[in-house]
């Protein structure tokens, strides 16, 4: 698990257009700040038939290293699955469109950068749909690609309910 101060540092450096606290809330909801997190996405209610919430299924065991995460993700993709991975649970469907390889996108900074790009795109769309408060709609779009589904499945309230305590930096007096 990545500690919150390090995540905030990465978010500020890698996706400066989005508030680091917003990205931290998303990462806490998506991966519990685990950089090697991996989930399998299933279409059309398949996950629910398997007893999993939403459109994804959690793996019984999570990868313990980047190498293991890459091996598992590649194997699942080769088997025809779509996976979400990393701190921000980036969908493998976005990689080619955004010009990244799986290896690149599993790097924490790149994973956060991709999330920042995607959330910026979703915010631009959400501003036309909800000009007074676009973030909740953008979060729903980030989660599901749908402006309502992220509300219905609890994702938006889950992200907005995440607590990210302010980080105080201690400076030793010289």
Where is each model-derived feature located?
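Non-catalytic cell-wall polysaccharide-engagement segments
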Residues: 1-22, 29, 33-34, 53-174
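Acidic helix-start/capping segments at beta-turn-to-alpha-helix junctions
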Residues: 28-31, 38-54
């Amino acid at each position: 698990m990545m500690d919150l101060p390090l995540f905030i540092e990465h978010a500020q450096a890698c996706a400066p257009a989005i508030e680091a606290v917003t990205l931290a809330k998303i990462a806490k909801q998506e991966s519990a700040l685990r950089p090697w997190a991996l989930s399998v996405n299933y279409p059309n209610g398949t996950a629910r038939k398997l007893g999993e919430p939403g459109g994804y299924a959690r793996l019984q065991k999570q990868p313990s290293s980047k190498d293991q995460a890459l091996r598992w993700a590649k194997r699942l993709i080769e088997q025809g699955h779509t996976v979400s991975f990393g701190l921000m649970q980036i969908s493998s469907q976005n990689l080619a469109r955004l010009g990244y390889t799986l290896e690149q996108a599993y790097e924490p900074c790149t994973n956060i950068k991709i999330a920042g790009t995607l959330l910026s795109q979703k915010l631009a769309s959400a501003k036309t749909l909800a000009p007074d408060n676009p973030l909740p709609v953008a979060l729903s779009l980030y989660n599901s690609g749908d402006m309502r589904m992220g509300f219905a499945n609890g994702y938006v309230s889950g992200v907005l309910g995440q607590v990210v305590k302010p980080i105080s930096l201690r400076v030793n007096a010289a």
